[in-house]
Every structure is written in C-alpha cells, then in structure tokens.
C-alpha cells in the first residue's frame, strides 16, 4: 500500500511529488512488488486529490498488479491502521503490525527514493519539504538536500512575517513544536509550519 493520503493540513509535499514524479513513484512500487510474488500494489489516495488520481490511473491502466484506490478525505486517513482498513477492508488492532494483515505500507517519498536508488543508483540525498502556515511569507514546497539548515529553508520561503507564535516540524496534528530552526533537514522532515497564533 502506498500512503498517498497526506491527510495532515498544510502538508503538500507528497501531492507535489505525485504530480511531478508519478513515473518514479510507480517505478519504485514495481521494484517493491518484485519482492512479493502474489502481491498487489495499491496507491491509496484521498478523493480530494482528483488530479493525482486521474494521472496515476492513466499510468497504471496496463499494470495488472497495481491499482488506485480513492479514499474518503478525512483525518486520520493516512494513519497506517486506518489506511490498511480503508484500502483493503482488513482490520488490525494496536498490538498487530501491517504484516499481520499481509500488508506493507510505504509513503510516496520512500518509493521515489527506492526508484532512484535501484534504477538510477542515486542515494537518498534530498527530499521535498513543505514550508507553510500563516506566518510564512511565501509558502511552498522545496526540493532540498538532506542536512540543509532549516533556517535556510525558511528564508527560501521568504522568511517569517515577524516572530511566529509557534513553529512545528511536520503536520499540525502529529508534528512537534520546534524551539529552534537551527537544525538540519532529515529524511523524515516533511514540513516546517509557522503560525502567528496557537
């Protein structure tokens, strides 16, 4: 199952990847499917991303082992257990792992990285990060090298509109408050959000 849900508000990094790198996404999924003889690949996307659904359906129409599943847009649709249930109808409880339901869940950025590593020989050196929130001058998505200082990334987005009340790494629901942005972008950095109010 490819987690294309990206259900947290403000984060659009995977959305941009699906629009701009769909071939690499599908190629990465095909690499993973080679590891499992009888597996089916599911691109699980919330139904508010109709442009991605349409594009990915076009690209997999001749791929018998891959299908696109449109999911209801709701939080926390992208959480692993909810995603598995919504995509396959298989329920797993908190003591179970996805493998207990016969599933592997990967995200968009991971599969693109798999494609690049296996097909092109390029190691994981960059990722897309969303910089957004009402305290950000020019919100957007940025393809940046791992290790880049997050202050530089914020400057690339035009900086903050004054001193933000709160800065969050990740989404507003599952992310965490940052006390400093003088830290590097890592492979798990999906977003930097700046807000003027709590």
Model-derived features: positions:
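Short connector loops at secondary-structure junctions
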Residues: 7-8, 31-35, 42-46
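Ferredoxin-type iron-sulfur electron-transfer modules and their immediate structural context
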Residues: 127, 150, 155-198
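Gly-rich Lys/Arg/Thr-decorated short loops/hinges at beta-loop-alpha junctions or inter-strand turns
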Residues: 1-14, 135
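Conserved "landmark" site that anchors the functional core of diverse proteins
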Residues: 15-16, 38
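Short beta-strand elements
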Residues: 1-2, 116, 190-194
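Hydrophobic alpha-helical positions that pack around
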Residues: 39-150, 156-163, 171
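Short, small-residue-enriched loops and turns at beta-alpha junctions
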Residues: 18, 76-77, 174-176
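Histidine-anchored nucleotide/phosphate-binding helix
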Residues: 19-35
């Amino acid at each position: 199952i490819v987690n294309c849900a990206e259900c947290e508000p403000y984060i659009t990094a995977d959305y941009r990847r699906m629009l701009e790198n769909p071939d690499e996404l599908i190629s990465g999924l095909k690499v993973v499917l080679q590891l499992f003889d009888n597996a089916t690949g599911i691109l699980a996307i919330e139904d508010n991303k109709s442009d991605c659904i349409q594009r990915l359906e076009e690209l997999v129409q001749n791929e018998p082992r891959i299908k696109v599943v449109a999911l209801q847009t709701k939080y926390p649709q992208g959480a692993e257990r909810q995603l598995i249930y919504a995509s396959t109808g298989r329920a797993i409880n908190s003591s179970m792992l996805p493998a207990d339901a016969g599933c592997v869940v990967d995200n968009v950025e991971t599969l693109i990285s798999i494609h690049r590593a296996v097909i092109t020989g390029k190691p994981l050196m960059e990722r897309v990060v969303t910089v957004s929130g009402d305290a950000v001058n020019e919100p957007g998505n940025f393809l940046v090298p791992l290790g880049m200082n997050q202050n530089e990334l914020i400057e690339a987005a035009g900086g903050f509109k004054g001193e933000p009340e709160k800065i969050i790494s990740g989404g507003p629901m599952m992310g965490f408050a940052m006390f400093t942005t003088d830290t590097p972008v890592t492979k798990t950095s999906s977003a930097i959000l700046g807000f003027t109010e709590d």
